[in-house]
Curated annotation (Swiss-Prot):
TM segment ranges: 108-128
Protein name per the record: KH domain-containing protein akap-1
Gene symbol of the encoding locus: akap-1
Organism expressing this protein natively: Caenorhabditis elegans
Span of domain KH: 528-595
Coiled-coil portions: none
Domain called Tudor: residue spans: 689-747
Biased composition (Basic and acidic residues): 186-211, 218-239, 247-275, 298-307, 363-383, 441-458, 481-490
Keyword terms: Membrane, RNA-binding, Transmembrane, Transmembrane helix
Localization (cell): Membrane
Biased composition regions of type Polar residues, renumbered to the chain: 152-162, 336-345, 494-507
A Pfam family assignment: KH_1
Length: 867
């Protein structure tokens, strides 16, 4: 706003007032207005900035008026440009800007615009000043040319100087003109003094005979001036893009250079005779012209590399390349600059690169190990004591040296150890191609590589290195680790190294402690058979051993994975822990036998290797937050993607939600239950009588799935169960069902039992026809469809849903409901709407919470769920 007012004041002609007075005047007007906003955020820096912009604007106004009122030139349109700028600058309407300004941002924008116009004014002033300076330089050049003596050669020189100025720019032209004027004045004074001396000395000049010789050099110098003129024209054509003219001038330059390269002999006598007594002034001009052309020629030649193309390479050495190719020696980088091919420097370089100079290096190259050199010449970080790569490099070097010594043995029966390097060196010594000092170096190198340790030790190191690179550590078989010695070894006591007092372990496993063999197992090993037993806290340190030595040995020798974790029973957490052994059945038995030999029952009666199966729920006071079984529910009136997992009828089925985050864990749960219940046959069965709603594990073929009891038949001792993850019902013998562990209940039940809304069978009964069943299966089996919950049944309280599928009728795909498709096919009819109630959100939550909250019976070892 301040800047707009400043522009208004400048446009009104407020040039006489100073910027500070103008600013105070504008701010006073601003405070008097009620519609405009106050500049509360304007600090000292902003005030200085506004004052500076007002001062620039004041100067810009004066400059615009001056440029608008300046004399019009016929050569260019400076006056029109200034008038255009002044009209744009004063086109701002301050009153309109003040009326439209409603924020500080708009005021800042006007300040920026004012600064931009000021910068544009400076640019216009600079261009005008530059053009005027160029016109002044042209006038000065005309005055200088008029002041010189008018001769034919002088006019040619002036035209050539003008062309040089055009080619090199105004700056180079000014330098040349100033040099020419100063030199001419000095030459006039010197020539007047030398004329008198030359006239006295040359009493008998022979002008008629020697004058043609004196004219020859002047003609050649004139040719040089013409050459300068052609070069300047060439640069002008290059700037304009005329390639044809440039090529013609280049051909002309080659011819003139060939002429100029010829030797020109100028005698002193011809120069002396060139100055006669009668026409002293006339003969002075060619001499002046020659000196001027020499100066201009030197100046132009300095600029030649910039005007012409890139220079050609200085020198090449074809003979050197031929020698390298014939001798098959790797080429060295050629020098970038060389003075002469026959110079001493080039000869020395060629001699150094000859094949004879590489005789010693070729010999040493055969005994040079590049890989070992790189390892030895590694960085300081790799060779530092704290670097983990240091020990690996030392082992790698020893392995490489051992392999080399093993391959270099010539005759091992006689006990003569002769490496390959010494054998090759002796051959070269016989031929006489290596000097004595060089042989001494190779001998020292071979002595350094001789082994200090036996080959057996190196081989052991080699095996240890390979074992370190494996996924898990392996213990090397030795007589100390034989089974017989292990069985005969004494059991640990209080004075043993593996006793609890001497062990570094505290005896309490606060978290899961596994053997190192666990890292090398794959994901398939997670579903191997598992065996768990109790360990007293007093024996945990003995089983683990010093730094895990005992548990590591048991795991590696029996190929199992051992895990020590906290006990699951609250009353035994402080006294016992659980040891878990995972592997194949034979491997688990082998591990338990070795553990029993190590800890015999006579000395360690508290160690009981009997299996421990944790109860599902110890008592009714158990915290159910971490192991509470839950059901997946459907959102109300919202479509979601589902898959039909089990079909009872066309209107009664089970669905799964494959997009739920927990659905991916179902496959792992099935594999885990198959490995757990398939290998162990001594797991507890369901009690008699079996209560309804108990969670259990039910076998189907070779797999085990989670199920819940629905009805128990006393006569046949059978149980009717419902599978909670895949849906469906089945009648099974009670002896086949097993109690379920608490850790298997953390995953929510994946299947949801639903009914199809709005339809019923055609005959009015509850039995659907085979055609309706086939049609329903064809629409949903193996597909992901959309589902929306619309209510629940009055009788069974089962959720009722609408299923949607995509049908392609022509080009457009439409979404249709299953019930409409069945009715259009004549396989179903409309159901009674009174049997379905649309539930609200609180009622749905209450029903679902009642369905998923488990209840407990008097049988404390099972979970009862109301279905």
């Amino acid at each position: 706003m301040v800047a707009a007012a400043a522009a208004d004041a400048l446009a009104a002609g407020g040039d006489s007032s100073s910027p500070s007075d103008l600013y105070n005047k504008i701010t006073g007007q601003q405070s008097s207005t009620t519609t405009s906003l106050s500049y509360a955020a304007c600090d000292v820096i902003t005030r200085h900035l506004i004052s500076m912009l007002l001062e620039i604007s004041n100067w810009t106004n004066d400059l615009a008026k001056y440029l608008a009122g300046s004399e019009q030139s016929s050569d260019d349109g400076h006056n029109e440009r200034c008038l255009l700028f002044s009209s744009i600058f004063f086109a701002i309407d301050p009153s309109l800007a003040l009326a439209q300004m409603s924020s500080v941002a708009s005021k800042h924008a006007l300040l920026i615009a004012l600064g931009g116009f000021s910068i544009a004014a400076l640019f216009v002033w600079y261009i005008n000043k530059k053009d005027k300076d160029g016109r002044k330089k042209k006038k000065v050049g005309d005055v200088i040319s008029n002041g010189l003596p008018k001769t034919a050669t002088a006019s040619d020189v002036q035209t050539e100087n003008g062309n040089v100025k055009k080619a090199n720019g105004h700056v180079n032209g000014d330098v040349q003109s100033s040099i020419g004027v100063s030199q001419k004045q000095q030459q006039k004074d010197e020539d007047e003094k030398t004329q008198k001396k030359d006239a006295v000395q040359n009493e008998k000049p022979s002008i008629d005979k020697k004058q043609p010789k004196s004219q020859a050099p002047t003609e050649k110098k004139e040719e040089k001036t013409v050459e300068i003129h052609t070069e300047t024209e060439e640069t002008d054509h290059v700037a304009a893009g005329d390639s044809g003219v440039v090529s013609e001038h280049k051909e002309h330059d080659k011819k003139t250079k060939q002429k100029n390269d010829e030797p020109v002999s100028i005698d002193k006598k011809s120069e002396e005779i060139e100055v006669p007594k009668q026409a002293g002034v006339v003969n002075e001009e060619p001499k002046k012209q020659s000196e001027e052309t020499v100066v201009e020629e030197q100046f132009v030649k300095k600029e030649e590399p910039k005007l012409k193309s890139a220079p050609t390479p200085l020198l090449t050495m074809p003979s050197k390349k031929k020698v390298l190719e014939n001798e098959q020696i790797p080429e060295e980088p050629t020098p970038t600059k060389m003075n002469d091919a026959t110079s001493p420097l080039s000869l020395d370089i060629a001699a150094q690169m000859s094949p004879a100079s590489f005789s010693w290096s070729e010999e040493m190259e055969k005994s040079f190990n590049e890989e070992e050199f790189r390892l030895n010449e590694s960085s300081d970080i790799d060779r530092s004591p704290a670097s983990p790569l240091r020990h690996l490099q030392q082992q790698h070097n020893k392995n490489r040296s051992s392999q080399k010594r093993k391959g270099g043995r010539v005759n091992g029966r006689d006990g003569v150890h002769q490496p390959q390097q010494q054998h090759q060196q002796q051959k070269k010594e016989e031929q006489g191609q290596i000097k004595k000092g060089q042989r001494r170096l190779t001998k020292e190198k071979s002595v350094e590589e001789t082994p200090e340790k036996s080959q057996k030790r190196v081989v052991l190191k080699h095996h240890e290195n390979e074992a370190g690179d494996a996924a898990h550590a392996q213990i090397i078989e030795s007589p100390h680790h034989e089974n017989a010695s292990y069985e005969k070894s004494d059991s640990p006591g209080l004075d043993s190294q593996n006793s609890e007092a001497s062990s570094q372990d505290s005896g309490r496993a606060t978290g899961p402690l596994a053997s190192p063999h666990e890292d090398g197992l794959t994901t398939e090993d997670d579903f191997l058979p598992m065996y768990e037993f109790e360990i007293p806290n007093s024996l945990v340190g003995l089983i683990i051993g010093v730094k895990g030595k005992t548990i590591k040995e048991l795991s590696v020798r029996t190929n199992v994975r051992m895990l020590i974790r906290q006990h699951h029973e609250t009353d035994k957490v402080k006294t016992h822990q659980i040891c878990q052994v995972r592997g194949k059945r034979d491997e688990i038995n082998h591990c338990l036998q070795m553990l029993r030999r190590r800890f015999p029952p006579a000395r360690f009666p508290e160690l009981n290797l009997q299996p421990v199966v944790p109860p599902v729920l110890p008592n009714s006071n158990f915290d159910m937050l971490s192991t509470q079984p839950t059901w997946l529910t459907l959102p109300e009136d919202i479509k979601c993607e589902v898959a039909v997992s089990s079909i009872i009828s066309a209107s009664h089925f089970f669905i799964q939600q494959p997009t739920h985050p927990s659905f991916a864990s179902l496959r792992h749960l099935d594999m885990y239950m198959g490995s757990l219940y398939g290998e162990q046959s001594n797991l507890p069965e369901l009690p008699i009588p079996c209560q309804n709603g108990l969670l259990c594990a039910a076998p189907v073929g070779n797999a085990w799935f989670r199920a819940v009891t629905v009805q128990y038949f006393d006569e046949t001792d059978e149980v009717f169960v419902k599978f909670v993850d895949y849906g469906g019902y089945s009648k099974m013998a009670r002896q086949d069902l097993r109690q379920i562990r608490t850790d298997l209940m953390s995953l929510p039940f994946q299947s949801t039992e639903v009914m199809l809304a709005h339809v019923r069978p055609v005959d009015g009964t509850t039995n659907w026809s085979d055609a309706a069943m086939q049609k329903f299966r064809a629409m949903c089996i193996g597909k992901v469809i959309n589902c929306k919950m619309v209510g629940q049944s009055h009788d069974t309280r089962i959720p009722m849903v609408e299923l949607y599928m995509m049908s392609k009728d022509g080009k457009d795909a439409q979404e249709v409901r299953f019930d409409q498709v069945l009715m259009n096919c004549g396989l179903a009819r409309t159901a009674d709407p009174s049997k379905m109630s649309r539930i609200t959100v609180p009622a749905a939550l209450d029903t679902e919470s009642r369905m998923k909250r488990p209840s407990f019976s008097s049988q404390t070892s099972q979970t009862a769920v109301v279905c």
